[in-house]
């Protein structure tokens, strides 16, 4: 066994090289699911090779991103979970950001909107000065969308407040809806028409009661806004 172990390691390296090249071809053909599947068959846990944790994490993140590109969030989550205990080994800030963004996208897809909003916003504050303005605005937009879609309550109100008070959000196309939500103004259908068109398919899916996530969020918001409005109305004797 000791004699053939070096050969096994060399075969694994060759296998990885071929599969990475094949995945690149599949990515160019926009076959993201198959590209991810091919990379997922690379043996990174063999005892014959000493694969660095940083390399493993990087590969798992790439596979997760490809599955997300193919709208397979379930399999993407499997690889993000594999990467999670290895993220501490990453030295490249860009790699860490890619992990966090992928994690946020999975939370978003699972309709864990408040958690997703927090993650996207945290990333924007941690790496905001190190990335392009367009990428930063994209992160902020994701945080705003998820915060607006989140279930009404004190935690959501705090998230909306943090976003509204952040001057960077004023550049967002969603700022007017954010402002109305934060200031507890009643939202009308025309106020959210443009916002609704910007949502991803999973964010527009129907709930058990036949409403969409946005419709439910707006209804909850308007009920709270109405309650506040009536509490502020007084009558002269």
Regions found by a protein language model. Name each.
Residues 1-237:
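Extended alpha-helical scaffold regions
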